[in-house]
């Protein structure tokens, strides 16, 4: 059985890179729960058009942030735990489904935290219940997200 990956090791392996990387930190990583965070870059190009003079982070990017802070790191952790090392390293997690409700907005420069709890895991498929909050604890969005591991 392999040693569990440390959060910083998982963070280094998350494949997304700027400008499409929406996870800065993993504060907690276990078999059933992961906690991650991201600060939205106020200079990000998408804010120029969404919405001019009153910029708001697009909901689709909030969902992507939830996946990068929750589904991807949790899948990496579980694959590392359950698969041969060479196979786990070649596993790519694809985001497959989301059912998310929005209850707030995120402005440029805000930091969000995502708490994801494992709901289902079998045959390289997983589903989490995720919740995104602002630094003050206000819930921005929550719901179920799913992914699957494929060999790359």
Question: How would you describe each model-predicted region?
Answer:
Residues 5-17:
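Short aromatic-glycine motifs in intrinsically disordered, low-complexity regions
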Residues 4, 71-115, 140:
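Hydrophobic beta-strand-centered segment that forms part of the acyl-chain substrate-binding groove
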Residues 20-22, 94, 112, 126:
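Hydrophobic core residues within well-ordered beta-strands of beta-rich domains
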Residues 1-3, 33-35, 105-152:
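HotDog/MaoC-like acyl-thioester-processing domains
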Residues 17-57, 61-62:
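Catalytic strand-loop segment that frames the active site of acyl-thioester-processing enzymes
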Residues 43-45, 70, 121:
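Short, acidic Gly/Pro/Ser/Thr-rich loop/turn segments
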